[in-house]
Amino acid sequence: MRTDYDVIVVGAGHAGCEAACAAARLGSHTLLITIDMNKIAQMSCNPAVGGIAKGQIVREIDALGGQMGIVTDRSSIQFRMLNRSKGPAMWSPRSQSDRQQFILEWRQVLENTPNLYMWQDSVTQFVIEGGVVKGITTALGLTFTSRAVVLTAGTFLNGLMHVGPVKTPGGRVSEPPATGITEQLRDLGFTVGRMKTGTPPRLDERTIDFSQCIRQDGEQDFHHFSFLPGVKSALPQRPCWIVHTNEQVHEVLRKGLPQSPLYNGQITSIGPRYCPSIETKIVTFADKTSHQLFIEPEGATTHEMYLNGFSSSLPWEVQIEALRHIPALRDVHAFRPGYAIEYDCFDPTQLTHTLESKLVKNLFLAGQVNGTTGYEEAAGQGLIAGINAHQNVTGGEPFTLARNEAYIGVLIDDLVTCGVDEPYRMFTSRAEHRILLRQDDADMRLTEKGYGLGLATRERYELMTAKREQIDRLIAYCRQTTVKANAINPLLQANGMQPLTQGQRLHDLLLRPQLNISLIAQALPELRAQLDAIEPARCDEIIEATEVAVKYRGYIERETLIADRVARLDNVTLKGKFDYSQIHQISTEARQKLQAIDPDTVGQASRIPGVSPSDINILLVLLGR
């Protein structure tokens, strides 16, 4: 068996799979090592991918040449585009996935990736010499050497699970924790944190009264995650269901609070603010008499259902008593209880934007070990870490994404610049340039970068350039075409809109919120002919992208100017220029933060909490700007 590799990836969750796949496809001999090979890319919590801002990350991963979008599309049992009622910057794709099919699809991807090897074992130590990582040692007593290591251990570092008073060591139910790594890195100067997450009980759908639920079906249109055509699920589609808690449920939960590990001191670590447990909800929102819950299928053929919104670490008897006060769940049977898990993580400000450690060369960290929460956030980090591990091995240029280029760029910049004091989840509100970071144009933003690296294929690159050309042609046609009033007025009046008094450019006509290209084409045979000339499989995608470009042109152009101005500060290098402890013109807090984080650029420095605009102005003066 081979024992020497270019890159070793520790942990085969969502971050690890993307990291290993990227490094191997770029040409590095890569070892992916995991505690249980039957649980590669396991969805430890909800059986879904995407959602608000998270869906944009998945599309960015796909555009760069990563795999999560493809795997998700192939295992999907329901797809929806969230936030349709808002502007396109907020549209976020989400897929309900078959949990087991998701694992099988990832396993196929990994096993068919050249240069990628897998091994089932637990890593206990890194081999570090002279501040450089050289490999790993395992629980079986084996040593594997490498030029780079990516740590993607998820919730497994000294993981401890809680169901009421019962505490069980583990990174996930039935899987042991990973020990030794935290202690070694702490001794090397890594700042260690402790965080908590949780998961709800799983229910038997045969014991649910669906007549008491609100049905929620998926959408049957052209949207999906991968930009590659023909990537789709062969699985039957399934609905989700909505139910609500009530005061009886809350009363049971309140009586159980003294037994809750969250409220009796058993759990002391910090949980995710935006995914609170049900006991946290009834305490934090004490005035609310009801909370919405989603009953989500775990797969196409299983009876197991996931109760989204009811994460809990209460004793099981309290959980089930509370559930049975929900009308649809009066006779419910459960397959497994909800539980909480505590785990170790590290301060991400001790990383560079490539996710390489500042303390140990060629050691990269990605995923929940950096204090994030969510499959998508982990996968995005894993992709960047895997790319840069390969770049380090081969002497290539570091690969990073700016805040105005990708949500992945926002995510990593937030982590390494601001750090985390609670599990970090991505939202559209975190991206100041979100109108430029839409889900529909991730390929046009990033595929050329992925192709330049060698990660995105020529097929993917040519599809992107063909799409761009078709959009440009359709936009040009809209600008050049004048629509006669008598040709369009019958359609306008039939749809309750003000008729034209004279001809108007098609481009300007499209600015009306009620109008879209497909509707106008019903009255204009020439426009219909333009649409018929587009490849049928991509026509809806081209139309949607064209409408966004036309209707939101002013916003996009304005935001581009703002982003360009901000980017100038990111082009002013700070690294190695100052001993911040000696700059007494800036505030004490700024000195301490700048010394600790050592930002690469003035732009990054300006985003550090505690560094004021006046501090930045002083730095610019000292730089001679």
What are these regions (language model features)?
Residues R2-A15:
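Beta1/beta-strand and adjacent pyrophosphate-binding region of the FAD-binding site
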Residues T3-Y5, A139-A148:
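Core beta-strand elements of the Rossmann-like FAD/NAD(P) dinucleotide-binding domain
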Residues V10, T143-G154:
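Short hydrophobic core segments
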Residues C21-Q125, L140, T152-P169, P176, ...:
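Conserved N-terminal/central alpha/beta ligand/cofactor-binding core
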Residues D36-N38, K54, T182-I320, T417-P490, ...:
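An anion/pyrophosphate-binding glycine-rich loop and adjacent beta-alpha core
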Residues V127-T143:
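Conserved beta-strand-loop-beta-strand element in the redox core of flavoprotein oxidoreductases
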Residues Y306-T372, T400-D413, C539-K593, D598:
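A glycine-rich dinucleotide-binding beta-alpha-beta segment and adjacent secondary-structure elements
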Residues R430, L436, T447-N617, V621-G624:
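Extended, charge-enriched "interface" segments that sit outside catalytic cores
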